[in-house]
């Protein structure tokens, strides 16, 4: 809804083929409504003293954001593109990940100390890596990976955008629904990823068919 600059990121060539690969489902029912669905995207601004706690990880297993590799191909429930809109260096509150945690069958022993809504910060968890990014860099990762952020200690604002991709049979996590105005101006490929269940008539005035 924020305009063309953000619409161009829906299927940006730098990562869209990676999303199709990791979400998978080619030649199966998972592609019945198209290759992908974006259930959520947002811009996050973070000032000094702020962070987001660690979350996700392979345990407990969650279908929506699961990592799966089977039969020689990926089938991941949700894959994120995190786009740095500013330089993110030491002290800037960078994204923190625990490598390999998307395959874990056990909860990280320190997770509760640094989880969301706790007083801890991601850089304090054993085995975590804080990722530094230049403006324009994109971090692609399955949402099942344990991730969060470090505490921002520098002045200024960290700015990122996040786009979450999954199979076309998914649904919105929150109550947001795309406006008719947005759907009218999107390309057919982008419209399919934003609203895969709705087939619009040639004028995009009303739904022609809704899939159950």
Describe these PLM feature segments.
Residues 111-112, 138, 145-212:
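Non-heme Fe(II)/2-oxoglutarate
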Residues 1-135, 148-157, 167-177:
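Non-heme Fe(II) oxygenase catalytic core, chiefly the N-lobe of the double-stranded beta-helix
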């Amino acid at each position: 809804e924020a305009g063309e600059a953000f619409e161009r990121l829906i299927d940006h060539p730098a990562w869209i083929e990676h999303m199709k690969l990791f979400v998978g489902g080619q030649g199966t029912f998972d592609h019945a409504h198209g290759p992908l669905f974006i259930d959520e995207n947002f811009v996050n601004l973070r000032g000094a003293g702020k962070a987001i706690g660690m979350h996700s990880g392979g345990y407990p297993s969650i279908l929506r954001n699961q990592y799966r590799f089977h039969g020689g191909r990926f089938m991941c429930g949700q894959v994120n593109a995190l786009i740095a809109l500013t330089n993110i260096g030491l002290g800037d509150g960078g994204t923190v990940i625990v490598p390999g945690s998307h395959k874990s069958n056990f909860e990280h022993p320190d997770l509760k100390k640094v989880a969301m809504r706790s007083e801890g910060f991601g850089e304090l968890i054993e085995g975590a890596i804080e990722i530094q990014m230049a403006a324009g860099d994109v971090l692609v990762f399955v949402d099942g990976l344990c991730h969060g952020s470090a505490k921002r200690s520098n002045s200024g604002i960290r700015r990122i955008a996040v786009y979450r991709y999954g199979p076309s049979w998914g649904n919105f996590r929150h109550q947001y629904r795309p406006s008719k105005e947005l759907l009218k101006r999107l390309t057919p490929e982008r419209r399919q990823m934003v609203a895969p269940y709705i087939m619009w008539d040639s004028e995009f005035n009303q739904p022609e068919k809704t899939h159950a």
